[in-house]
Amino acid sequence: MSSGGLLLLLALLTLWAELTPISGHDRPTFCNLAPESGRCRAHLRRIYYNLESNKCEVFFYGGCGGNDNNFSSWDECRHTCVGK
């Protein structure tokens, strides 16, 4: 294989590694939990990781209880559950 072909292969492998989300084995287990509004009655806009869509999405949190799949920012959710 020519050096140009090897360079192209290396570039494609690097791009694939950067774009591939973290696997379920590397993701914290709480990322797999459904969002829980908790037992209080506030109506706080929060972010959770949706395992089916592999995206962070909005839900409304009651202010207490719930689980750890509850983030205050999109960046925090993405960094923790989706990957870099």
From Swiss-Prot:
Keywords recorded for this protein, A-Z: Disulfide bond, Glycoprotein, Hemostasis impairing toxin, Protease inhibitor, Secreted, Serine protease inhibitor, Signal, Toxin
Residues linked to a glycan: N70
Domain BPTI/Kunitz inhibitor positions: 31-81
Signal peptide: 1-24
Sites marked Reactive bond for trypsin: R41, A42
Tissue: Expressed by the venom gland.
InterPro entries per the UniProt record, alphabetical: Kunitz_BPTI, Kunitz_BPTI_sf, Prtase_inh_Kunz-CS, TFPI/VKTCI-like
Gene3D superfamilies found in the cross-reference section: Pancreatic trypsin inhibitor Kunitz domain (4.10.410.10)
Record GO cellular component, one term: extracellular region
One Gene Ontology molecular-function label: toxin activity
Disulfide bridge positions per record: C31-C81, C40-C64, C56-C77
Cellular compartment(s): Secreted
Family from the record: Belongs to the venom Kunitz-type family.
Functional summary from the UniProt entry: Serine protease inhibitor that inhibits plasmin and trypsin.
Protein name: Kunitz-type serine protease inhibitor C2
Origin organism lineage: Eukaryota, Metazoa, Chordata, Craniata, Vertebrata
